[in-house]
């Protein structure tokens, strides 16, 4: 890991009392080997552990060790997901960063898993980067993929998740500038390489079903799908609208054209689409994933120089968790 980033995690991004503790302990000549356990306050899907291991790998020294659950593991409330045994001076200042990474990433991944399960086997793409700070957008999308999303919108998120590339359609802005959906679709088709799916927005200017047919006639077999993103002001995308678009495409001889739904999708709305048998092929989900609340994590010292010791309310010593694997 970049030394400058490590320094940032241990200074500007760290709770100030950790630096004050480091200075006080150093002045007293105290640098014990401590055993510290990290655990969550609720069930969920663990994410961010790979980043934590990378951080620890940059600060731990000879004789220090770490164990962790695997990235993407299901975790239970109060289950130990990360254990570090090492000199406190080496890793203590990273506590804020380690907890924050686990909290945010696990919150996003857990919500993504809920969305994916609600979709009943249909593809879910993360569209949430526009709802978070750009410095964390790719990390959020990586967590969404860990949670089960089939793709994400940003190149950075796709790269972090090991995908072949980002997923996306086209913005309303481009269609508005062209002034006609078919003109925009033809220009897009002419410019984009073959590996970019031709999925066209059809809610900008005309009735969605009418526009879907116009685009299907214009692009023919090259059209992979139409995207319905009807805004709140027009009642959003409904089950009936999806069924109508599907029926009209089929009647016109375009059964290969899929239907991609986005726009304010929640877990409950997706469940409603599935329960009603709406012929949706893929969902684009944004804020429901990106605005997921973080999962609280705690880090406690449980052992000091081999002697069980912890704060009141906790059990001293390092309990066994057979799911932990040695990572450092």
Residue ranges and their predicted role:
Residues 172-328:
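Glycine-rich phosphate/ribose-binding loops and adjacent secondary-structure elements
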Residues 1-156, 160-194, 222, 298-328:
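Ordered alpha/beta subdomains of enzyme catalytic regions
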């Amino acid at each position: 890991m970049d030394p400058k980033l490590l320094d940032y995690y241990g200074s500007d991004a760290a709770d100030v009392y950790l630096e004050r503790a480091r200075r006080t302990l150093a002045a007293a000549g105290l640098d014990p080997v401590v055993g510290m356990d990290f655990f969550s306050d609720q069930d969920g899907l663990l994410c961010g552990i790979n980043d934590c291991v990378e951080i620890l790998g940059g600060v731990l020294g000879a004789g220090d060790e770490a164990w962790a659950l695997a990235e993407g593991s299901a975790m239970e409330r109060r289950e130990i997901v990360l254990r570090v045994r090492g000199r406190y001076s080496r890793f203590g200042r990273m506590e804020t960063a380690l907890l924050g990474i686990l909290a945010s990433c696990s919150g996003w991944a857990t919500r993504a898993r809920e969305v994916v399960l609600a979709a009943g086997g249909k593809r879910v793409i993360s569209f949430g980067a526009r709802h978070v700070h750009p410095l964390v957008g790719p990390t959020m999308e990586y967590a969404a993929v860990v949670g089960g999303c089939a793709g994400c919108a940003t190149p950075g998120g796709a790269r972090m998740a090991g995908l072949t590339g980002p997923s996306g359609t086209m913005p309303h802005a481009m269609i508005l500038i062209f002034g006609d959906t078919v003109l925009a679709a033809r220009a897009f088709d002419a410019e984009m390489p073959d590996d970019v799916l031709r999925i066209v927005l059809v809610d900008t200017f005309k009735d969605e079903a009418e526009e879907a047919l116009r685009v299907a006639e214009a692009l023919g077999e090259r059209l992979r799908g139409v995207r319905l993103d009807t805004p709140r002001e027009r009642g959003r995308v409904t089950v009936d609208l999806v069924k109508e678009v599907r029926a009209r495409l089929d009647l016109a001889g375009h059964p290969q054209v899929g239907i991609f739904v986005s726009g304010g999708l929640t877990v409950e709305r997706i469940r409603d689409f599935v329960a009603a048998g709406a012929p949706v092929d893929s969902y684009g989900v944004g804020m429901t994933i990106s605005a997921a609340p973080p999962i609280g994590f705690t880090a406690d010292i449980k052992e000091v120089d081999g002697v069980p010791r912890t704060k009141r309310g906790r059990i001293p010593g390092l309990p066994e968790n057979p799911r932990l694997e040695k990572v450092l």
